[in-house]
UniProtKB/Swiss-Prot annotation:
Class in the EC hierarchy, top level: transferase
Protein name as catalogued: UDP-N-acetylglucosamine 1-carboxyvinyltransferase
Species of origin: Helicobacter hepaticus (strain ATCC 51449 / 3B1)
Pathway as given in its UniProt record: Cell wall biogenesis; peptidoglycan biosynthesis
Keywords: Cell cycle, Cell division, Cell shape, Cell wall biogenesis/degradation, Cytoplasm, Peptidoglycan synthesis, Pyruvate, Transferase
Keyword Cell wall biogenesis/degradation: yes
Gene name per UniProt: murA
Length: 421
């Protein structure tokens, strides 16, 4: 099994190109199930999760041609299965995204209950209740969601009790081919959701309210869609992770291929800590701070501070002068990285969904274990300032969401190698 070995790094320098957003690529891939034409998708991130979903689509009967690791063409005219099997779905929670498109197009599907990061319960109840509201009969048997909509899905008023990104995306795709109007209240408005809506809108689905938390979708009544070529938006979480790597070493680095307006919550917090920025249309340069001030974070839905960045900022907090506080409001059990950061010497105390981090903590390299995707990136960030050598194990979590991580970090001057145990 692979692991990463990182030796304390000097000040970083140079530039890094940000990959396409994994969390946009996955619903876009699922949405190709709604198409009647060949769909070309560019700027895909070369990560395990994208390959997993592509494999699932191929199992269903989608013809996929890879042009390069970041570009493919899908043709979904000959779907032969509507059963998303456990062997593939168990590897990634986002596989649930095929539920809406399959049910909307075929009126029947079976989708294995998903796997992925072990972060709290993250139930699929919200997806199921919404589909039932649209006329589906759903049962859970033998670890599968078995969904049937005789006569097809019908538009409905969907009120999400809690904002859910994948739930919103699933219902948006289900509503695309449904009969009549679907009104989604309390929809997620992350950039990845917005891109999905924009693509469907350009493909023949009338959608009102894009970018807000109320959406009205006029379904095509079963008529399949025509997609133009798609370019996946840049990954704001990957960008934020590299900003934290630059920040913890108090370096000046440049990110290329970014959407600065998607990064406001992250860059605002870094400015509060003491960093500056030079911004141009699609690039961003981090400027060093005179000193690193402590901070407070409350994770919340977009445009608030993203839960996918709290672990990396926790690593950064160990080098800030004073006490920082992080409150996690979106997911339970999302502090699993704390014990591993403590192994490096971090002074962190937990109380419920609050973490208190005292800095400045001198960190010392050790063997640590990744527990989920973003927690593993926090260990990478912390290891950059840890004396000696840090070995990060179970990095298959990193490979799920970060493209060529060690190569990009090496380009910035990090002493990092991938080894086999």
């Amino acid at each position: 099994m692979d692991y990463l070995q990182i030796t304390k790094s000097p000040t970083l320098q140079g530039s890094v190109s940000i990959s396409g957003a994994k969390n946009s690529a996955l619903p876009i891939l699922a949405a190709t199930l709604l198409s009647q034409n060949e769909v070309t998708i560019n700027n895909l991130p070369d990560v395990a999760d994208v390959k997993t979903l592509a494999k699932l689509l191929e199992h269903l009967g989608v013809n996929i041609t890879w042009h390069k690791p970041t570009s493919l063409t899908c043709l979904a005219e000959n779907i032969v299965h509507t059963r998303a099997i456990y062997d593939i779905v168990r590897k990634m929670r986002a596989s649930i995204l095929v539920l809406g498109p399959l049910l909307s197009r075929f009126g029947y599907c079976e989708v294995s209950l998903p796997g992925g990061c072990a972060i709290g319960a993250r139930p699929v109840d919200l997806h199921i209740k919404a589909m039932e509201k649209m006329g589906a009969d759903i049962q859970i048997k033998g670890g599968y969601i078995i969904a049937q909509a005789k006569g097809g899905l019908k538009g409905a008023d969907i009120l999400f009790d809690k904002i859910t990104v994948t739930g919103s995306e699933n219902v948006i795709m289900a509503a695309a081919l449904a009969q009549g109007k679907t009104h989604i209240i309390n929809a997620a408005k992350e950039p990845e959701v917005v891109q999905l809506c924009e693509i469907l809108s350009q493909s023949g689905v009338k959608i009102e309210g894009i970018g807000g938390n109320e959406l009205i979708i006029y379904g095509t009544g079963g008529e399949l869609l025509n997609f133009a070529p798609i370019c996946v938006i840049p990954d704001r979480i990957e960008a934020g992770t590299y900003l934290c790597a630059g920040a913890i070493t108090n370096s000046s680095i440049t990110l290329e291929n970014v959407e600065n307006n998607h990064l406001s919550a992250i860059t605002d917090k870094l400015e509060e800590i003491g960093f500056g920025f030079n911004k141009s249309e699609h690039s961003l340069t981090l400027l060093p701070a005179q000193s690193l001030k402590p901070f407070e974070i409350i994770t919340t839905e977009y445009p608030g501070f993203p839960t996918d960045m709290q672990a990396q900022f926790m690593a950064l907090a160990t080098q800030c002068e004073g006490t920082s506080v992080i409150e996690e409001r979106l997911f339970e059990n999302r502090f699993m990285h704390v014990s591993e950061l403590q192994r490096l010497g971090a002074d962190i105390s937990l109380k419920g969904n609050h973490a208190t981090i005292k800095g400045i903590s001198p960190l010392l390299g050790a063997d640590v274990m990744a527990t989920d995707l973003r927690a593993s990136s926090a260990l990478v960030v912390a290891s950059l300032v840890s004396e000696g050598t840090t070995n990060i194990h179970r990095i298959y979590h990193l490979d799920r969401g970060y493209e060529r991580l060690e190569h990009k970090l090496q380009h910035l001057g990090v002493n990092i190698v991938r080894l086999k145990s």
